């Protein structure tokens, strides 16, 4: 049981020196303190008798040689026999009997039972000290060079990950470059189309048509004709300009310019349109209410909003100067014509 406990302590903490003194009380309680002391005293007495006989035989030799040999033999014999007693503590050298003689000047101390463990602790401490000094030196150099880099230690294995990633990047970089070039080329090819497809007029216009008629198929042109006819039926576009410009998309694009809008407004005024633009728009919405009963809710809301806004606009026109009335009429006519 005692041996198993000693073995467990040694396995759990092989560098602990306090384990040498922990089992003293257990051994004394197991064997008895008197028996242990008598046994140790008898052993030490026999060792001292052997040392005294050997010192008498070597008395004719020189004093220095005699001291060295006796010191060597005494330490060796005592250490050898005491190491057999596994549970004897280190401080038993104080129980040496008084009749024993020792020619050496140094006190007799038995060798410790855990020499390998103690040496391994010393080696471990020295290795850690060297590692700590090297890490501190690396940190000082990095701080001096203004490079905040964590010093590498032999216990860390995370420094292999960036190297591994960089190694993979060698094989992936060519494919990434090719994909990037392909994406750039595709963007360059699609950019003219997007620039052509963007409308060059106001976002509030009813038709966003392109100046180049070749970019649209015949089905798109037919749809545009149908949309144009629907706008004419609702009164949003005058039917006078339909036969001359029904299939010309460039004319639709030119209609949205300010100069063309002014020309159309002058042409409308010269043709004798006595009714105001607000009245024509209200009439067109009333016609749309009659023609499309399915959209009654939407049309009624629009008509009501127009009826509410018409007195306010008429009052504004009356309050302003008469010279500006013609300009306001022209601007309203140009906006409603589109």
UniProtKB/Swiss-Prot annotation:
Presence of the UniProt keyword Phosphoprotein in the record: yes
Comp. bias regions, Low complexity: 50-70, 267-306
Signal peptide feature range: none
Residue spans of biased composition, Polar residues class: 307-316
This protein's record includes keyword Transferase: no
InterPro entries (alphabetical): Mbr1
Pfam family, one: MBR1
Modified residues (Phosphoserine): 119
Keyword terms of this UniProt record: Phosphoprotein
Region entry Disordered, spans: 50-72, 267-322
Protein family membership: Belongs to the ISF1/MBR1 family.
Function: Could influence the NAM7/UPF1 function, possibly at the level of mRNA turnover. Participates in mitochondrial biogenesis.
Identification of the protein by name: Increasing suppression factor 1
Species, as recorded: Saccharomyces cerevisiae (strain JAY291)
């Amino acid at each position: 049981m005692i041996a198993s406990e000693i073995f467990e302590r040694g396995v759990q903490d092989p560098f602990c020196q306090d384990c040498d003194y922990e089992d003293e009380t257990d051994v004394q309680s197991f064997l008895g303190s008197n028996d242990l002391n008598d046994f140790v005293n008898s052993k030490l007495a026999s060792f001292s008798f052997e040392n005294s006989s050997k010192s008498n035989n070597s008395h004719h030799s020189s004093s220095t040689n005699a001291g060295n040999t006796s010191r060597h033999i005494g330490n060796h014999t005592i250490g050898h026999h005491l190491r057999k007693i596994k549970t004897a503590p280190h401080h038993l050298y104080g129980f040496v009997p008084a009749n024993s003689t020792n020619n050496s000047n140094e006190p007799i101390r038995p060798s410790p039972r855990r020499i390998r463990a103690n040496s391994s602790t010393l080696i471990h401490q020295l290795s850690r000290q060297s590692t700590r000094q090297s890490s501190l030196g690396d940190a000082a150099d990095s701080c001096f060079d203004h490079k905040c880099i964590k010093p590498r230690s032999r216990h860390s294995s995370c420094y292999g990950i960036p190297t591994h990633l960089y190694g993979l990047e060698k094989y992936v970089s060519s494919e990434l470059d090719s994909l990037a070039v392909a994406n750039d080329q595709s963007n360059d090819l699609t950019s003219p189309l997007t620039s052509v497809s963007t409308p060059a007029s106001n976002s509030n216009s009813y038709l966003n048509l392109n100046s180049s008629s070749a970019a649209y198929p015949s089905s798109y042109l037919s749809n545009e004709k149908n949309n144009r006819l629907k706008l004419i039926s609702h009164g949003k576009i005058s039917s006078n300009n339909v036969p001359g410009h029904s299939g010309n998309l460039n004319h639709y694009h030119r209609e949205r310019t300010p100069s063309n809008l002014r020309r159309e407004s002058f042409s409308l005024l010269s043709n004798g349109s006595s009714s105001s633009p607000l009245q024509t728009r209200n009439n067109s919405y009333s016609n749309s209410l009659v023609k499309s009963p399915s959209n009654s809710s939407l049309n009624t809301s629009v008509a009501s909003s127009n009826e509410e806004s018409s007195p306010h606009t008429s009052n504004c026109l009356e309050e302003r100067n008469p010279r500006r009335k013609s300009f306001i009429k022209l601007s309203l006519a140009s906006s409603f014509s589109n």
